[in-house]
Amino acid sequence: MKVITSLISSILLKFIHKDFHEIYARMSLLDRFLLLIVHGVDKMVPWHKLPVFLGLTYLEVRRHLHQQYNLLNVGQTPTGIRFDPANYPYRTADGKFNDPFNEGVGSQNSFFGRNCPPVDQKSKLRRPDPMVVATKLLGRKKFIDTGKQFNMIAASWIQFMIHDWIDHLEDTHQIELVAPKEVASKCPLSSFRFLKTKEVPTGFFEIKTGSQNIRTPWWDSSVIYGSNSKTLDRVRTYKDGKLKISEETGLLLHDEDGLAISGDIRNSWAGVSALQALFIKEHNAVCDALKDEDDDLEDEDLYRYARLVTSAVVAKIHTIDWTVQLLKTDTLLAGMRANWYGLLGKKFKDSFGHAGSSILGGVVGMKKPQNHGVPYSLTEDFTSVYRMHSLLPDQLHILDIDDVPGTNKSLPLIQEISMRDLIGRKGEETMSHIGFTKLMVSMGHQASGALELMNYPMWLRDIVPHDPNGQARPDHVDLAALEIYRDRERSVPRYNEFRRSMFMIPITKWEDLTEDEEAIEVLDDVYDGDVEELDLLVGLMAEKKIKGFAISETAFYIFLIMATRRLEADRFFTSDFNETIYTKKGLEWVNTTESLKDVIDRHYPDMTDKWMNSESAFSVWDSPPLTKNPIPLYLRIPS
């Protein structure tokens, strides 16, 4: 039998790219066949041009391979007595006691995992110089937007999520970057200082050091609750389970220093604050609904149930609303809905319950969580592909909501506010003058920036960063250059090696990456003709996009594995997604909320009816809704 297996494997090897031979040798026979399928499709016909059902099949095969070979544990897993989940039927303040086999998994200060093996870059942290890369390849020359696909609410949403998921623990040691002479005159800062990422020993032989996440990586809405008991105490009223919010304005409250009172306010701006305020109102509305159902519920009970419900609503909106607009294709519409509802769909699941299989019934509601043998975490690579600051414009366009809406519910422009005036304390002051409704409507009608080369906001190249408590630091930073440095410092592979690790064929020339002649010329100059030196962020921005995708295909494959993992590894989305844990009313609340529009309508009943023409609150509001397609979704063929 071994001889036959060896013979088959050697034959298959001839069809596999040489860069995958090493990983291929470690695969099971089944996985070798699956890699051959993925590899064959990649070479012959792009998966996104296949009929929807075949495209979904390809993505399921690819996701399986990533789950087997792209989940790398960092840090030792403590061995101890297994706890009883029944003792913790709620989300804890610091993320502990979710995984029954390891109480610390997903808690504040746990390690970032990895999707790709780390590549030590200490010898070339400054090659090419990050400020040269930022100036020649990233800095905005002319604003490029996303058309009608993605608006400023969508741009705010992803930062809202990042504040829920990830933030690296910093060291006390400062690094300084100085602009080389060749670009110094074009750099907003001639030099800047910042704290390096803290390297922490893991106790592992292979991955010796790692980084710690000072946010809880679970989808637990720590963006409004905080990642520890101290912050949670700051945001709670301790009355009827509710969180602090201005009843008069619907905006966040502020402390004596002018800092917003919410779960995470570091490096925030008015768009994120607006979403925090909206979901605090959602939490409080859940408390009221639960209290109406059962007047005997105490403050702590109401808070715990409402947090579960609100977190699930946020996760659902991200899965079947935000991501669908980000990856605007029929295949991903089907795929993201299948992640939540399964291939059998919402009607079947609502009528008959979970079908048992995650493919047929969805990840949500599975009988038990699934971590594929690797303790849950978010990853260094996940952090890298979520570098999306190019979504931000230079000004926010404030519209006149007192005027009569025009064609497609459009509104006249009355003011342009610099994004600098919408950050931190100043942003909170500016927002108080604008008001929630005007801000949300204005963001809804404004297109976000596109994730492209030479579209990184210049105002972010001279910005005041915050410490973890939201206080301004003394040193300005060049965020574009800093992001290049961070990926290198954290041993995230550069673009080509990243692709190899994700079973993607590496590029051999700049023309494989982009057709833009100017970009090719600058890439060749900055990287001295060596495609292997290309930084990941630059490659993700330069890469030709799939039609309908706002992000690169390379970034998407990290989404493919990690979007599912955030749901399937969490018992509150799987074994504990039920009436016992959520209450009957709470589960009904989650199951009947399908979009951000539903949440807006609940708290601002006239807003979308009056000013939103689009199908989703994440696409530009004056865009027409999609026309109904009579062809069943799974049978559609991409145009």
UniProtKB/Swiss-Prot annotation:
Gene3D superfamilies: Haem peroxidase domain superfamily, animal type. Induction: Induced by salicylic acid (SA) and by some chemicals generating reactive oxygen species (ROS, e.g. nitric oxide (NO), intracellular superoxide and singlet oxygen) such as sodium nitropruside (SNP), paraquat and rose bengal (RB). Accumulates locally, at the infection site, in response to both incompatible and compatible bacterial pathogens (e.g. Pseudomonas syringae pv. tomato DC3000) in a SA-dependent manner, with a faster response during hypersensitive reactions. Changing H163Q: Reduces oxygenase activity more than 100-fold. It comes from the Eukaryota. Changing R387H: No effect on oxygenase activity. Changing H163C: Reduces oxygenase activity 17-fold. The record marks R266 as: Transition state stabilizer. Ca(2+) binds at D164, T216, W218, D220, S222. Transmembrane segments: none annotated. The keyword Metal-binding applies. Keywords: Dioxygenase, Fatty acid biosynthesis, Fatty acid metabolism, Heme, Hypersensitive response, Iron, Lipid biosynthesis, Lipid droplet, Lipid metabolism, Metal-binding, Oxidoreductase, Oxylipin biosynthesis, Peroxidase, Plant defense. Signal peptide: none annotated. Changing H163M: Reduces oxygenase activity 6-fold. Its main location: other. PANTHER family: ALPHA-DIOXYGENASE 1, PROSTAGLANDIN G/H SYNTHASE. Belongs to the peroxidase family. Forms monomers in solution. This is Alpha-dioxygenase 1. The gene is DOX1.
